[in-house]
Amino acid sequence: MRLNRSLTVVAALSGFIAMSGMATAQEDCPRGTLDKSYCDRNGDLTADLPTDPKKVINPSTLIFSYTPVEDPAVYQKVWDGFIKNLEKTTGKKVAFFPVQSNAAQYEAMRSGRLHVAGVNAGGNALAVNCAGFVPFAMMAAPDNSFGYEMEIIVPADSPIKEPTDLKGHKIAFTDATSNSGFKAPSAILKADFGLESKRDFEPVFSGKHDNSILGVVNKDYEAAAVANSVLNRMIDRKVFDKAKIRSIYKSETFPTSGYGYAHNLDPKLVEKVKEAFFKFPWEGSALQAEFQKEGKFVPIDYKKDWAVLRKIDEATGVKYTCK
């Protein structure tokens, strides 16, 4: 599978090429921007459950993955208690799938090898349109507030004081599907500061937020655009000395990672999956220890809650055209 986008993300999505088994005879139905493998009859912008019962799945083992913002091994331990809760609630075995890239995660869901996932905020639209991902939840604080900001960071002793100073420098981004790691900063730098990629600054890609952050800490990168949710968690874990970096820009608040399921998952199983999320006991859990500002999972409406991110995609020329 290849994505044709005005922002070329061939490298980021190379894992989509040469997938088989999912592209069956296509149904003539409303689908909006969804890939031709899916239908959207109710207009919620996500893929409907297949009308053919043979395409509905109820696996004996559920595969779960979390967006690869840092070393997957770190988060496998963080999610262990949640996975046990998911097993208890669904009555299924659950396996954690440690993905190394966003593209690998989307590919796994599209090809039927991933059933439940936490997908990076900026990648939700891509996963929805091209992998049949149906987001239904995100983390929120006890008072129901949620979200994160994009920050541009530099080494503490850098001569770069504000975004306009980035002209003529290299900026580290994570990958082309990331909202805070690429799409939002690209749009903001162009719209608010008149800085265009390749014309005014040289973009480089680190692959993940932690790579970008540590690259600035170690002065491998002159600047980096990152999600401050990841940044703050790394600071809280004392992964690095926060005195070694400085923030020169902080954006408006964006929705954070979306949690969802494969569109063809059995509806009765989906209800159990949702129950496992919304009734998960946060108090004393590893999730509470890692995501300290969060206190629960709350329902989301992809059509409404991701509108701002789809607008950023539109502004930066992203088109969800899957082949």
Where are the model-predicted features located?
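Bilobed "Venus flytrap"/periplasmic-binding protein-like clamshell domains
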Residues: 64-87, 122, 145-214, 229
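A ligand-binding cleft/hinge motif common to bilobed small-molecule-binding domains
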Residues: 121-132, 185-191, 215-218, 222-242
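Short helices/loops that flank or line small-molecule/ion binding pockets
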Residues: 103-117, 130, 164, 209-229
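Bacterial N-terminal signal peptides
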Residues: 10-18
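Periplasmic-binding protein-like
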Residues: 67, 142-151, 239-277, 292-312
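N-terminal hydrophobic or amphipathic helices and topogenic motifs
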Residues: 2, 23-104, 289-323
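Short beta-strand-to-loop elements that line the ligand-binding cleft
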Residues: 93-100, 198-208, 246-249
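Acidic, polar ligand-binding/catalytic clefts
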Residues: 107-165
